[in-house]
Amino acid sequence: MTQTFDPGAFLATCSGRPGVYRMFDAEATLLYVGKAKNLKKRLASYFRKTGHAPKTGALVSRIAQIETTITGNETEALLLEQTLIKEWRPPYNILLRDDKSYPYVFLSDNAFPRLSIHRGTKKAKGRYFGPYPSAGAIRESLSLLQKTFQVRQCEDSYFKNRTRPCLQYQIKRCKGPCVGLVEPEVYAEDVRHSVMFLEGRSNALSDELNASMEKAAMALDFERAAELRDQVALLRRVQDQQSMDGGTGDVDVVAAFVNPGGACVHLISVRGGRVLGSKNFFPQVGIEEEVGEVMSAFLAQYFLGGIDRELPGEVIVNVINDDFPAFVDAVEELRGVEMVISHRVRGTRARWQQMAVTNAEQALTARLANRQHVASRFEALAKVLGLEDPPMRLECYDISHSSGEATVASCVVFGPEGPIKSDYRRFNIEGVTAGDDYAAMHQALTRRYSRIKAGEGKLPDVLLVDGGKGQMSMARDVLNELQVPELILLGVAKGTTRKAGFETLYLNDSAHEFTLPGDSPALHLIQQIRDEAHRFAITGHRARRGKTRRTSTLEGVAGVGPTRRRDLLKHFGGLQELSRASIDEIAKAPGISKKLAESIYANLHSE
């Protein structure tokens, strides 16, 4: 593709039918995918001499080839466009950076049903409620249900092996069905009430609970009446916090907001008239910077991209676009759902719409302000380090362990826009003396920079080490051993008071020692990155330590490998319950012989 692209010659043979077009650069890299009702007319608009946005002009200047695919109609073009965008993720397209499944509340189908969070395919027998826009929203609902109706949320394996009620019973978050502390019909009633709440029938539920409360009071069952009173009070509190008069339909409210710094789409999920929660999306804005184009791209990628996602019957938007009819047809063709897109709404729906618009504007404003704040800190750090330009990539390392147990090293990465979490890494440290932080850091840096030297990852401009002269010298030794190209090495040691704002800094070698004022933006950036590395290391260490403590007592038993160990713990609901089991009870577990049960029992009860 070395020849110059000739738009006139291309357009002379281009079809005027609906279809999809793909733009490539001279290296055959796909730059952009688009759709059109009339391919020739749409593509001709790119080659006008005036009226282009800067990003469109940049795209056109790189075009070396255009390929087209004619489709039967606009709907087919939309579906093909989304398939290609999802597969290739072209740099000039609006891209939705959210491809994970959304959580549901799952109610199991057994004698004493369990409420839990579920993601992925719906294989288990039971009922699913949702989807919820975030894990936080679903946890909030489950917490409320646990307080109000005390339906169990424990794993079935844990439930089946209880011999006495757990802590959840003591704090009134469960009625103890595992040990027979609640009658099946009473528990079933609590489950029915939970279902009413999850279906959005809170008003009917409140009326029913009020009637039951009055009935209990008339029967002088004041304990039951007080319990029902508390349930009604909790429900009223939720109703006061949410817009509840929107009917019983399922609605998603979507608002898009665009300014020169980026775009935000705010989505509110309403199921059965109840607001389940909301979520912000910050799509990568391509050449289409108009708010209507952002909305159109979001709807197509969000609703057509997740095949396992339940679709609402109505989507309320704050802007309209000519692509909406094709989108609605595509939803019906691909998913078999009749969807209505509403723009002019009244009453509660109008309040939801305005709420989404306000949240989108505020979220983008806050994001851009934070980005500007971080960028100013990077500029301040550049001055401190004597650099002409701010560094583009900072890495910081930290070590976490408990008296040498389960040592974990962390690596966090920051850029001018904030943390780059996709590049975070943890290292489980092995084969070093317990508590030897220098050896642990040496191993982590060696593993990290050996991979970078091999082409896996990017070198930072600044390497930040949480430690004093010893850690600095060790880091310099690793870089020299691996012949890593010159980069800035910055050590951060706590001052004599060990308080924030009094850190001692070491630049490149331990001889260059200095401090910064407590109000220095550069120091604030260093503290932010160091604290993030510390947090990331601690969470990794705690997870590793917990896993080790759960399984280490079984690791020495011959015949109990990782799979059997996992199955055994799942069968008994944890190590504590397994420790309480007799030899005969252990032998009843799948795949465990009497002889192996004796070995397990002896191992668990050895001093």
UniProtKB/Swiss-Prot annotation:
Protein localization: Cytoplasm
Main location: cytoplasm
Domain spans labelled UVR: 203-238
Matches recorded under Gene3D superfamilies: 5' to 3' exonuclease, C-terminal subdomain, GIY-YIG endonuclease, UVR domain, UvrC, RNAse H endonuclease domain
Domain named GIY-YIG: residues: 16-94
Highest taxon of source: Bacteria
GO cellular component terms, A-Z: cytoplasm; excinuclease repair complex
A single GO molecular function term of this UniProt record: excinuclease ABC activity
UniProt keyword list: Cytoplasm, DNA damage, DNA excision, DNA repair, Excision nuclease, SOS response
Pfam families recorded: GIY-YIG, HHH_5, UVR, UvrC_RNaseH, UvrC_RNaseH_dom
SMART domains in the cross-refs: GIYc, HhH1
InterPro entries assigned: GIY-YIG_endonuc, GIY-YIG_endonuc_sf, GIY-YIG_UvrC_Cho, Hlx-hairpin-Hlx_DNA-bd_motif, RuvA_2-like, UVR_dom, UVR_dom_sf, UvrABC_protein_C
Record GO biological process: nucleotide-excision repair; SOS response
Record CDD domains: GIY-YIG_UvrC_Cho (cd10434)
UniProt subunit comment: Interacts with UvrB in an incision complex.
UniProt record similarity statement: Belongs to the UvrC family.
Main function: The UvrABC repair system catalyzes the recognition and processing of DNA lesions. UvrC both incises the 5' and 3' sides of the lesion. The N-terminal half is responsible for the 3' incision and the C-terminal half is responsible for the 5' incision.
HAMAP family: UvrC (MF_00203)
Name the UniProt record assigns to this protein: UvrABC system protein C
